[in-house]
Design a protein with these regions (language model features):
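Acidic, low-complexity intrinsically disordered segments
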Residues: 54-96
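Short non-domain terminal segments
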Residues: 5, 14, 40-41, 67
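Residue-level detector of solvent-exposed, low-hydrophobicity positions
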Residues: 14, 22-26, 33, 49-50, ...
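A short, structured beta-strand/loop element
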Residues: 17-61
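Alpha-helical protein-protein interaction elements
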Residues: 7-8, 18, 34, 66, ...
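Short, charged/polar N-terminal "headpieces" of proteins
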Residues: 1-25
Length: 96
């Protein structure tokens, strides 16, 4: 599973799975197991704003901190995403 960075953000690894790259760009935030069933999931918009689909085990301050981190780094993160996917940013049309 590709990681966006080699370090943790608010004590969580930011990653995506190669089988989920058919969806719009998003970020899973999880522990070392990187199990997406229990990880948080943020969809990323073209301006860096995020939509929290699932909070996982994140506390509210971790959610807002990770959202801010994504906002500040989304262009770099999107470049990493594009290494694996040709899907774009979240536009509000995701089937759950």
């Amino acid at each position: 599973m590709p990681k966006y960075y080699g370090f943790k953000v608010f004590d969580h690894i930011l990653y995506f799975t190669t089988h989920c790259t058919v969806e719009a760009m998003h970020v899973h935030a999880g522990n070392e197991e990187m199990n997406e069933r229990i990880a948080a999931k943020f969809f990323v918009k073209a301006n860096g704003d995020t939509v929290l689909q699932k909070a996982g085990d994140l506390k509210p301050h971790q959610v807002s901190g990770i959202q801010q981190f994504i906002k500040e780094n989304y262009r770099e993160m999107y470049a990493r995403w594009q290494e694996y996917s040709d899907t774009g940013f979240y536009t509000g049309r995701v089937s759950i």
